[in-house]
Amino acid sequence: ASFBZAPAGBSASGEKIFKTKCAZCHTVBZGAGHKZGPNLHGLFGRQSGTVAGYSYSAANKNKAVNWEEKTLYDYLLNPKKYIPGTKMVFPGLKKPZZRABLLAYLKESTA
């Protein structure tokens, strides 16, 4: 399903998804250091590959995508297809509900 057809997200469900599938490599806490992946605090409205102190792949820097709900929804379906050459090893979330839930959580937790 495209972003326009995405269901409304549930942030409580999204938090569970984040903790089980994302938190090993990412944090959302303001001022926290990077893990295997960059800190996601301030994610919305930010350009890919621009967080200070994190070593991004050239692919992430060169993609120069602005992270918003639609771009993240598409990216999270298949990160390696969206940004070929990304270091992110996560295969993606195939279910539209899971992507919508994760985005609802990220919107709240990274602001």
Curated annotation (Swiss-Prot):
Keywords annotated in UniProt: Acetylation, Electron transport, Heme, Iron, Metal-binding, Methylation, Mitochondrion, Respiratory chain, Transport
Gene3D superfamilies: Cytochrome c-like domain
GO cellular component: mitochondrial intermembrane space
Residues bearing PTM N6,N6,N6-trimethyllysine: 80, 94
Taxonomic superkingdom: Eukaryota
Chain positions with N-acetylalanine modification: 1
MF (Gene Ontology): electron transfer activity; heme binding; metal ion binding
Pfam family, one: Cytochrom_C
Main location class: mitochondrion
SUPFAM superfamilies per UniProt: Cytochrome c (SSF46626)
The keyword Nucleus is assigned to this record: no
Post-translational modification: Binds 1 heme c group covalently per subunit.
Localization terms from the record: Mitochondrion intermembrane space
Residues that, per the record, bind heme c: 22, 25-26, 88
InterPro entries: Cyt_c-like_dom (IPR009056), Cyt_c-like_dom_sf (IPR036909), Cyt_c_1A/1B (IPR002327)
Protein family (similarity comment): Belongs to the cytochrome c family.
Function as written in the Swiss-Prot or TrEMBL entry: Electron carrier protein. The oxidized form of the cytochrome c heme group can accept an electron from the heme group of the cytochrome c1 subunit of cytochrome reductase. Cytochrome c then transfers this electron to the cytochrome oxidase complex, the final protein carrier in the mitochondrial electron-transport chain.
Protein name per its UniProtKB record: Cytochrome c
